């Protein structure tokens, strides 16, 4: 079975770090992620995904992330239930992050030009592939099995 999630989005507010009773750091934040289609009104619907990080990753996120920051999160979906003080049961679905990547430089963050920053990131990514010939199919035949490393 496989439980793997990869998300790219922006934080909806500053992350919150707490400690468990065993003093293990845990940081939570919500990621706004656009869906892959445009609605009839011409907008992309957005999902708000709760993210949980633990230990060292929790400390890194708490110290470096702020509202609006563009990040990539890799992790797994977790569901859990809990009862409040009134006895009401609550169900939560969240992503437990294994990795959080910062997708924009800290120095340029918060300038108010988020869409422009995303465009620049896309252009930088596209430049990685400029030197690849159009007819390259991703496969290079090996002339002799003597060249194989095994």
From Swiss-Prot:
Region listing for Disordered, in residue ranges: 105-124
Single Gene Ontology BP annotation: DNA recombination
Gene3D superfamilies reported for this sequence: Nucleic acid-binding proteins (2.40.50.140)
Motif interval(s): Important for interaction with partner proteins: 145-150
InterPro entries in the cross-refs: NA-bd_OB-fold, Primosome_PriB/ssb, ssDNA-bd
Recorded GO MF terms: single-stranded DNA binding
Entry keyword set: DNA damage, DNA recombination, DNA repair, DNA replication, DNA-binding
CDD domains in the cross-refs: SSB_OBF
Domain of life: Bacteria
Subunit-structure text: Homotetramer.
NCBIfam families the record matches: ssb
Stated role: Plays an important role in DNA replication, recombination and repair. Binds to ssDNA and to an array of partner proteins to recruit them to their sites of action during DNA metabolism.
Protein name: Single-stranded DNA-binding protein
Lineage: Bacteria, Bacillati, Bacillota, Clostridia, Thermoanaerobacterales
Gene: ssb
């Amino acid at each position: 079975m496989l439980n793997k999630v990869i998300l790219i989005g922006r934080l909806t507010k500053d992350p919150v770090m707490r400690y468990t009773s065993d003093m293990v750091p845990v940081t939570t934040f919500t990621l706004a992620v656009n869906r892959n289609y445009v609605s009839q009104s011409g907008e992309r619907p957005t999902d708000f995904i709760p993210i949980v990080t633990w230990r060292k990753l929790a400390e890194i996120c708490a110290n470096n992330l702020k509202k609006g920051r563009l990040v990539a999160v890799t992790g797994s979906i977790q569901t859990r239930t809990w009862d409040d003080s009134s006895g009401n049961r609550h169900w939560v679905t969240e992503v437990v992050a294994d990795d959080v990547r910062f997708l924009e430089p800290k120095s340029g963050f918060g300038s108010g030009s988020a869409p422009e920053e995303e465009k620049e990131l896309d252009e930088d990514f596209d430049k990685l592939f400029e030197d690849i010939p159009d007819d390259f199919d991703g496969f290079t035949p090996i002339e002799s099995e003597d060249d194989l490393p095994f």
